[in-house]
């Protein structure tokens, strides 16, 4: 289920994004990026519609995933 991120309190959204960024541990290449930079990257992707905030009823977790990946998962159900 897609969570309408614009309806969340700012602090709640920030916490969700930070949790996601810390969980992902993505390698950014030669230049390490700060937590703040990574959070802003994810926030920009949410605003642009590139990624979605998604609730998994099966796992009872919230995740951030690319829009295309969410749609592909829906087609498999």
From Swiss-Prot:
- Domain of life of the organism encoding this protein: Bacteria
Q: Which Gene3D superfamilies match?
A: YehU-like
Q: What is this protein called?
A: UPF0270 protein Spro_4577
HAMAP family assigned: UPF0270
The cross-references to InterPro entries, in alphabetical order and at most eight, read: UPF0270 (IPR010648), YehU-like_sf (IPR036685)
Please state which protein family the record places this protein in: Belongs to the UPF0270 family.
Question: What organism is recorded for this protein?
Answer: Serratia proteamaculans (strain 568)
């Amino acid at each position: 289920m897609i969570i309408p991120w614009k309806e969340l309190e700012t602090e709640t959204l920030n916490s969700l994004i930070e949790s996601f960024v810390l969980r992902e541990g993505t390698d950014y290449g030669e230049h390490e990026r700060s937590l703040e930079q990574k959070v802003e990257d994810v926030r920009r992707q949410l605003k642009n519609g590139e990624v979605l905030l998604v609730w998994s009823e099966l796992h009872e977790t919230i995740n951030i995933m690319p829009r295309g990946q969410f749609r592909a998962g829906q087609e498999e159900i």
